Regions:
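Beta-strand secondary-structure signal
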Residues: 65-67, 148
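Short, well-structured beta-strand/strand-turn elements
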Residues: 46-62
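Periplasmic/extracytosolic POTRA-like scaffold domains at the N-termini of outer-membrane
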Residues: 5-49, 95-124, 161-163, 171
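C-terminal solvent-exposed extensions
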Residues: 148-175
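Extracytoplasmic segments of membrane-associated envelope/inner-membrane machinery
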Residues: 67-143
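Ser/Thr/Pro/Gly-rich low-complexity linker/stalk segments immediately outside membranes or between
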Residues: 1-3
Length: 175
């Protein structure tokens, strides 16, 4: 059993996976190979909210391998309507967890459609840009859907304006 990205993201533990499979009677340990249904294991694990993909197969040495890839959060959303969730690297909503995740937090007037589209794109941009990833602490969305950035360092609030101009505005700020 291997959780491929467990160093960076700890949403899923080996113990949790074993527990899920044991409850469903699918944990392979102690079973003969003919009694192990790898597709059922994959199907059950795919239903787990923090798993992006699970691959289960039997090796040429007759061992059962389970490889798990976790969903990767891009941005955390805490909206004015009380919603609290993550958007993952595919633009899908992930339930909030107490697990510490180092991503920018988006607050303010945010509905799910806006979060899964515009904020998702902004979050991806920040996450893949080393400079902005280290600088952006919070993204605030005003009632007019304008973006304000709260940096990790300093007391300033950076007003970016409408979200469709963010790449140009970030480039200007970085110079």
């Amino acid at each position: 059993l291997a959780i491929k990205d467990s160093i960076d993201y700890g949403f899923t533990t080996e113990q949790q996976i074993k527990s899920v499979l044991k409850k469903k009677g699918l944990f392979p340990e102690g079973k003969s190979l003919k009694d192990i249904n790898v597709r059922s294991i994959e199907k059950i694990l795919a239903q787990y909210p923090f798993i992006k993909n699970a691959e289960c197969y039997i090796t040429s040495g007759n061992k059962v391998n389970i490889e798990i890839y976790q969903r990767i959060p891009v941005i955390r959303v805490i909206s004015d309507n009380g919603d609290n969730y993550y958007i993952d690297d595919e633009g899908k909503v992930m339930d909030y967890t107490d697990q510490a995740v180092h991503v920018a937090i988006a607050t303010g007037f945010i509905d799910r459609k806006f979060a899964q589209n515009e904020l998702y794109e902004l979050g991806k941009y920040i996450r893949t840009n080393p400079f902005w990833k280290s600088q952006v602490e919070q993204i605030h969305v005003t009632p007019k859907k304008e973006i304000e950035i709260v940096p990790r360092v300093g007391d300033q609030i950076l007003f970016l304006g409408k979200i469709d101009d963010y790449t140009e505005n970030f480039s200007k700020l970085q110079k």
